Structure formats: C-alpha cells, structure tokens
Amino acid sequence: MRKKLLFFILFVLMITGIAVGIHDYFHWQVMLTTETFTESTEKIWNPNRGFYHIYGFLISDEPADMSEQLDRQMQKDTDHALAMAQINLREYRDKEISKEGLQNIERLFQAMSVTKEHWIVRFLYDWNGENEKYEPESIDFVIKHMQQVGGILTEYSDSVFTLQGLFVGNWGELNGTKYADQQTFL
C-alpha cells in the first residue's frame, strides 16, 4: 500500500512537472514597451461627442442670408465638435413650406456644411414650451413638412450628426403634444 501511495505521488509530481514545462514552453510572452509622456495643454479635437451650443433659426418666406446668421451666432464658439440647429417652422403651421422657405432651409444647410462641426438637427414649431399655440392643427402638415425637408437632409447628410425629435411637442421634444397618441403613429 505504501509503495502504491509513493508511486501515485511520484506520478502526480511528474505529470505536474510536465504540465508546468509545457505551459512555460507555449506560454505567450508579453512584450512591454516603455513610453514617456509629457503633459500638454494642447486642445484635443474630439468629434461627435461632448458639449454643444444651440443655434435657433426661424424659417420664413423672407430671403435670408443664413450664412451670415450662422456666422454671427457661432462667432464665439470655437471649441466644440457638435452644434445643434433648431429650425423653427411655425410660420408654416397651417400650410406647406413655401419654395422660399425651402430655399432658406437649403441655404442654412449649405452654411452648416462648411463648418467644422457636425450638426444635431431639430425641426420644431415651438421655442417657448407653448406648442399648442404653434403646432399645426393637422398631423398632415407635420408629415408634409417632414417630406419636404427630407431631400435637403439627404443632400447634406455628411454634416448632420443626427436628427433629433419628431417636429412636434414643446421645444420639438414630443412632450405636451396632441400627436403623441398611438393612433397618430399608426
């Protein structure tokens, strides 16, 4: 019995030694490279994330220099990779967006496309939390407005980071709107 126990212990030690040897032979060696870093106050451009400024544009039939409006609003913003354009369509709450209105929207997107920012775009009818005053009486106008601006969004999609909201509700955020029921979305 004693010989069997001794033989078993030697066998276990031998198997353990072989396993350790195989492990050491095949184990991947981690190669470390030493790097030296120095502190820097240099600004790092970090696209598509972080804080952003919000810029508002009221669209109407009056010809507008959207590039000048955008430049004027953005003159102090030099350090953000994102920006939000709130495009107010309240002038069209009871009608389709006119040819002139669509031209102003197109001019705005042209101006936005030459900035370094990527744009969060929100179409809305209300800036003051009073959507019942400015929202279209019929969801059909909202849908038509979405269709009308769709081509512009597609054309300038390289500068659009995301489209935010669904046009309706206080501040275009879908809250407090009569169109938030399930029937409207069907």
Residue map of PLM features:
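Boundary/entry segment of secreted carbohydrate-active catalytic domains
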Residues: 26-81, 86
